[in-house]
A protein has these predicted regions:
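Electrostatically charged, flexible surface regions
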Residues: 136-241
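Glycine-rich phosphate/pyrophosphate-binding loops
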Residues: 116-136
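Short, Asp-centered acidic motifs that coordinate Mg2+ and/or phosphate
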Residues: 88
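Short beta-strand segments
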Residues: 6, 32-34, 91-94, 125-126, ...
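A cross-family phosphate/adenosyl-ligand binding-site feature
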Residues: 3, 13-85
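Active-site metal-binding loops of divalent metal-dependent hydrolases
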Residues: 9
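Alpha-helix C-terminal capping segments
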Residues: 78-83, 112-121
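Glycine/threonine-rich flexible loop motifs
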Residues: 97-106
Length: 241
């Protein structure tokens, strides 16, 4: 299996070497990651200026590039720039959960979406802000579940969030609602500083990614890049001549 690893936390992400070692058990690994932190870049790509791509030898025996652009551009460069094919794109492990509507802003999730748009299977991995040990300890369990149920034959992208601390089990989930929002206090000189605030409301519905993760369950959500409201489309299409 040929595997591409990317992220939005950059080449300096502390968990990256550990994820690489785990992925090497699955196949041949290539790493193409942002040169600098790219959290919150969503699905942005660079259209108006060139960006730097550098080969580096940070991880012995693993071909590695840094890209001075977004996570989506890392995937685009790997597939369209290098003209290579990958069986799986792994994005992460992100420092911070990508659940609820935060998925829309996530560079981690968007890199996985870009991979799917370019014909690959993709896995987005995230955990909390405090530690990565729990996530690393449960990667085998997540992978075995994906393989046991042949899930990549049923969907192209899975968004996986692994809670910190004690893990109670695994739940297949759907995307939840808002988790964070922002306030914009003025800091003078016509500047405002976006300040995240938690707006999550617990519904104790463990079929929702936000509730599942915050109650100690690994959340596995099948996502799609398609944004059409298909039930409404089928209804409206009857009005077409």
């Amino acid at each position: 299996m040929r595997i591409l690893i990317t992220n939005d936390d950059s080449i300096s992400a502390p968990v990256l070497p550990f994820l690489i070692q785990w992925a090497k058990k699955l196949g041949e690994v290539t790493v193409i990651v942002p040169k600098f932190e790219q959290s919150g870049k969503s699905h942005s790509i660079e259209l108006h200026k060139p960006f730097e791509v550098l080969a580096c030898d940070r991880f012995p025996g693993v071909r590695t590039y840094t890209v001075d652009s977004s996570p989506a551009d890392c995937v685009r460069y790997a597939i369209l720039g290098l003209r290579e094919k990958f069986d799986l794109v792994i994005s992460g492990i992100n420092r911070g959960y990508n659940i609820g509507t935060d998925i829309l802003y996530s560079g981690t999730a968007s890199a996985a979406f870009e991979a799917v748009c370019l014909g690959c299977k993709a896995l987005a991995l995230s955990t909390g802000f405090e530690e990565f040990d729990t996530a690393l300890a449960h990667l085998d369990e997540v992978w075995e579940m994906l393989q046991k149920h042949d899930l990549f034959a049923k969907n192209d992208i899975y968004n996986v969030n692994i809670p910190e601390g004690e893990v109670k089990g695994v739940r297949f989930t759907r995307q939840g609602g808002p988790f964070y929002s922002d306030e914009f206090p003025s800091i003078g000189d016509n500047l405002v500083r976006p300040t995240g605030i938690c707006v999550y409301k617990d519904s104790h519905d463990y079929s929702v990614d936000t509730d599942a993760v915050l109650h100690g369950y690994i959340s596995i959500s099948p996502l799609i890049p398609q944004r059409t409201n298909m039930p409404l489309f089928h209804e409206l299409s009857k009005l077409n001549p």
